C-alpha cells in the first residue's frame, strides 16, 4: 500500500511539474485536462500551480465555462480540469475554445507521447504495450534510441530494440541481437517479446522485411530461410528441391542483411556458428552432393562448400589433371578465388597448400636443360620456385590440425619432387659441375669479399644466414622489395664444395688463401676461423673498423645499444643461425621450413631496425651454403655404404686423399675448389642420396653438390633515409552507371596502379547507400592486390543485389567505397534508383 501511495505521489509531482511548464511565459494560456477515468479527482486539490488557477469543469456547466473564460476573466491562466472523457465534437460546446487552447494528458501513455512528440493517432499502440513502459530503465533505453520520426513500425521496433539493447532504431539490429543470443527454441529476447505482447509484432516485421512466412513461426525456420535464400543468390545451378520452399521473395533484403552479418567484425563469429547449425540441420553436404563444383564456386555460405571445392581440386591433382577448370578458371585461379572468401581463416592454409601442390604436380613434366649455363639460368629464373613451392606445401601441410585426408596428395608431391625433379636436375647438374670451365660461369662464393665488400665507402652490414638457400633468399627479396625504403638487387653465387658451414664461412671472409689441413681443419691465411672471435680477428686484418656479432646478441637491443655497436664501424658481419640450427638436429629437422619463414622475418626486421636506429643503410645478405630437404625417410637403397677409411665423412660428401670410384659418386679435387695445390679429393653423390653415416638427421642435408646446396643468394640492399611517400592501390568505377534499373546489377572496377613498393595492396568494401546512410545493397569485397602491369588484367566485376523496398526517384542514392582497414570512405558515386514497380 505504501509503495502504491509513493508511486501516486511521484506521478502527482511529475504532473505538477509538467503543468507548471505549460503555463510559463507572459501570454495567457488555457489548458484542458480531460481525466477520462477521474484518476486524479481526489488529487487535483493538491496541485500547486505557480502561474494559473484551477477551474473545475462539469458536464452540465459548459456554457457558463465558455462565458467565464472568454468574457468574465480574459486575463488569467486556467487549468480546466474535467473528471470525465472529452465529449464528442457535436456535444462539446467548448470545441472552438479548444482550438486556441491546449490539451493536457496525465495517463502514462499520453505523458510518454507528449514528451517524445508522438502523434495521438498512435496512442492505441502505446496503450496496448503500456506494460512495456512500466520499467524506468527500459523506457530510458527507448528514449536513448532518439527516434526522429515516429510511425507504427518505428514505435514497435523501438520497443524491440530497447529489449535487445540496440544502439539504433533498426529492425536489422534487432534481428542481429536475437540471432546472437545463442539459442534457437528458447531465446531470451523472443521470450521477453512474448512477455510484453510484442511476439507477433516481431514475426510480422520478419515477414515485412525478410519475407519469412510460417503458420507457426520459429527462430530455427527463420534462420533456415535466411541462409538458404542467401545461398540461392550465389549458387549458379538450380537449388535442390528440398531447399526451394525456403527461398524468400525478399531476397534483396536478406542478401544485404546476411552480407553485413557475415562481414561484421562483431557478428562474423556468430554467422559462422549459425552457418554450421544450418549446415547440420539440413545436411547440406548430402543435399549438395549432386551439384557440380562449378555451380558452387562463388558460394561461401557454408564451410562445407569449401570442402566440396577442396575435394575436387585434390582429386584433379591426384589424377595429375592440371588443366582442369571450373567456370573457365584454372585450378590456381580457383585457389585464389576461394582463399579470399569468408571462411579463409579456417580454409586458407588448405588452399595455399593446394596451390603449392599444383605447382609441384605441374613439375611432373619437368625438363632439365643440358648445358650447365642453361641449368644455372633456368634455376635462377624459374626452377627455384619448385623448391619454394615444395617448402610452402609442407609449411601449410604441417600447420593443419588434421592432414590425414591429404596423405595421398603428399605422397604424390614427394614422388614428383624427388623422382621427376631432383633426380633429373641433379644428374645433369653434376655432369656440368665437373666441366673444366664451370667455375667461371657465375660469381663464386670464394670471391665474395673482393667482389662485394672491397673498396666500399659506406658502412656496410653483411648478414650471413646459415643455410639460407637461394629460394629462401628470394622470398626475403620479395619481402624487402615491397618496402618503399628498400632498393634491392638479388644475385647468386656458387658456394665452395663441400658446401658445409666451416668452409662456407671461411670463403665469405677476406683472405689471401684458404686451406684445409690434414686433420680437415679449415684455415684462412693460415689461421683458424671456426668461431666468432677468430673470424673477427681475420676480418680486422683487412678492415680495421670492423666487428663480428651474433644475431641473437643484438636482436633485442635498444636503440642506444645498437648505436654503440655500429658507431665508428665501417664493416659489420652479423651471423644468423635459424635454419641450420633447426635442420641439423634429428628431433627438429622437420621444422626446417618453419625456420625458413622465421629467418626471412628476422632478417627483414633486423635490416629495418638497424637502418632506422643505427644510421646504417647498406646491407648484404648471403649464406655459407644451402640445403636439400625431403620429407620421406630415406630407404636403405638411398644410402651409399662407405668403407672404413681415414677420411672426413659427411652424409653428402667425403674428403680424403683418394677418390672414390663407385656408381653414383663423382670426385673433384680440393685444390680446384680452393685454388691451391691441395691433393685431397672431394667425393659426392650425383643424386640426392647420402652416404651411410650414424647419428644426426637424414631429411635435412647439405655439403653436397646440387643447386639447392650450392647456389646461394647475394642480396644487395640500400635503405633510403627519411620518409618515403607510399599510397594504397586506388580503385575506380569503370561502368558508366547513372541509373539503377534492375534488382541485380553487375559493375566493373579497375585498380588504378599495380601493387609495388610504393603502392600498397588494399581491401575495399563496396555497397550502395541512401543519403541518410542506410545500406540498400549487399556488401562486395574488392581485393586491390594485383601486380599486373597490364591495366586490362586489373579489372574486377562485382555483383550487387538491392533491398526489396520502395525507392524515391527524387532522393539521393550512392555507390560508396570504403577502405576496410581504416573504415574511411574513399569515394561515392551518385545514382538514381529507378527499379520498375518499386520506386514511387
Ranges and model annotations:
Residues 1-460, 469-619, 623-840:
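…; additionally, a secondary subgroup of soluble metalloenzymes is captured
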Residues 463:
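Beta1/beta-strand and adjacent pyrophosphate-binding region of the FAD-binding site
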Residues 466:
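Ligand-binding pocket scaffold of soluble enzyme catalytic domains
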